């Protein structure tokens, strides 16, 4: 199936009804037309402000409305963030993502956020932030600081969304994506499988993403991590093949986007992750923690990469870091390297 400018629900439903073997074959063919199938982009995600979020997202342990035992933390100091970015770079990541548990950032925090972006860029890393909804001015300021990507997930279909979140509308999410795009920042947006949604809802989510004026450059697909104390703690487990199918359809519908295995990898065995890569996933979060939930340790990822013959993708040289491409693969294999730029001294 050729890439379409706009998809219809019937076309997406047809993909969900397709035999999995045929679907994987189609997804892998499309993937190879646009990407090296042996290259996986590696990102690290840091929670720069944790907990006490006023939103009521039913899956999230950071909501102030749920008793999950999560300790709240104020916005991190800029140098603390940059030290984490150095460690991520030394471990082989090429993109550093910073997440804050806010409904939206306060203007008084913007100078610190801008410094974080500039510092991460000075390290030779791609930068990404997820801070909630943005104003036009805030998006422009982040773009001016050099932010590469902004993450703002749609989470699920418009029809099912109200069952999961009531404190932020679907349109607010779409509006933020528009502001990010208009500011010249690349868009990162995806969703979660396992919220209690139907197959039609999964199709609706992918339809929304693929039919944006410009599809997201990065599409994170999360498997629900059930956290005690949240309303979704007792949800049914996601069938591995259903998750793999969602990855494959995301690849088919958004052939030039990075499809990222995000939250939930700790729950997946190696075989499931391998099939996700075969289905067209070509990005992962690397490190022991995603915001506040577990993620496979680096050594496990390295072992799986070796078994599958996968290599970390080498990114374009950024901000004068002329050695990053040559060092990247070795850095991934040698996580304790001491080599890094001191952004604070720049």
From Swiss-Prot:
Q: Write out the catalysed reaction.
A: (4R,5S)-dethiobiotin + (sulfur carrier)-SH + 2 reduced [2Fe-2S]-[ferredoxin] + 2 S-adenosyl-L-methionine = (sulfur carrier)-H + biotin + 2 5'-deoxyadenosine + 2 L-methionine + 2 oxidized [2Fe-2S]-[ferredoxin]
Cofactor comment: Binds 1 [4Fe-4S] cluster. The cluster is coordinated with 3 cysteines and an exchangeable S-adenosyl-L-methionine. Binds 1 [2Fe-2S] cluster. The cluster is coordinated with 3 cysteines and 1 arginine.
Residue span(s) of domain Radical SAM core: 38-256
InterPro entries xref list = Aldolase_TIM (IPR013785), BATS_dom (IPR010722), Biotin_synth/BioAB (IPR002684), Biotin_synthase (IPR024177), Elp3/MiaA/NifB-like_rSAM (IPR006638), rSAM (IPR007197)
Question: Per the entry, which co-factors are needed?
Answer: [4Fe-4S] cluster; [2Fe-2S] cluster
Residue ranges annotated as coiled coil are none
Q: Name one GO biological process term.
A: biotin biosynthetic process
| EC numbers for this chain | 2.8.1.6
- Binding-site residues for [2Fe-2S] cluster, renumbered to this chain: 97, 128, 188, 260
Q: Which PROSITE patterns match?
A: RADICAL_SAM
Q: In which pathway does it act?
A: Cofactor biosynthesis; biotin biosynthesis; biotin from 7,8-diaminononanoate: step 2/2
Briefly, what is this protein's role? Catalyzes the conversion of dethiobiotin (DTB) to biotin by the insertion of a sulfur atom into dethiobiotin via a radical-based mechanism.
Please name the PANTHER family in this protein's record.
Answer: BIOTIN SYNTHASE, BIOTIN SYNTHASE, MITOCHONDRIAL
Q: Which family does it belong to?
A: Belongs to the radical SAM superfamily. Biotin synthase family.
Q: How does it assemble?
A: Homodimer.
Tell me what this protein is called. Biotin synthase
């Amino acid at each position: 199936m050729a890439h379409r400018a706009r998809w219809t629900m019937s076309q997406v439903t047809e993909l969900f009804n397709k035999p999995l073997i045929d679907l994987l074959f189609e997804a892998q063919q499309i993937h190879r037309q646009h990407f090296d199938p042996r290259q996986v982009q590696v990102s690290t995600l840091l929670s720069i402000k944790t907990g006490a979020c006023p939103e009521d997202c039913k899956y999230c342990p950071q909501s102030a409305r749920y008793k999950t035992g999560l300790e709240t933390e104020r916005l991190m100091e800029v140098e603390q963030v940059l030290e984490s970015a150095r460690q991520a770079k030394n471990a082989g990541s090429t993109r550093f993502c910073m997440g804050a548990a806010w409904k939206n950032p306060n203007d008084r925090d913007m100078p610190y956020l801008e410094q974080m972006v500039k510092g991460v860029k000075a390290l030779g890393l791609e930068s990404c932030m997820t801070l909630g909804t943005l104003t036009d001015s805030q998006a422009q300021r982040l773009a001016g600081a050099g932010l590469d990507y902004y993450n703002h997930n749609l989470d699920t279909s418009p029809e099912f969304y109200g069952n999961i979140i009531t404190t932020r509308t679907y349109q607010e999410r779409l509006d933020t994506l528009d502001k990010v795009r208009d500011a010249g920042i690349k868009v990162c947006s995806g969703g979660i499988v396992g919220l209690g949604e139907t197959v039609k809802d999964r199709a609706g989510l992918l339809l929304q993403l693929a039919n944006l004026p410009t599809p997201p450059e990065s599409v994170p697909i999360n498997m629900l991590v059930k956290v005690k104390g949240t309303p979704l703690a007792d949800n049914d487990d996601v069938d591995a093949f259903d998750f793999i199918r969602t990855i494959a359809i995301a690849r088919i519908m958004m052939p030039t986007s990075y499809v990222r295995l995000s939250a939930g990898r700790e729950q997946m065995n190696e075989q499931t992750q391998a099939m996700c890569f075969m289905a067209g996933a070509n990005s992962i979060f690397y490190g022991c923690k995603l915001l506040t939930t577990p993620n496979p340790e680096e050594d496990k990822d390295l072992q799986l990469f070796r078994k599958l013959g996968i290599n970390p993708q080498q990114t374009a040289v950024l901000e004068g870091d002329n050695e990053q491409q040559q060092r990247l693969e070795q850095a991934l294999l040698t996580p304790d390297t001491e080599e890094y730029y001191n952004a604070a001294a720049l």
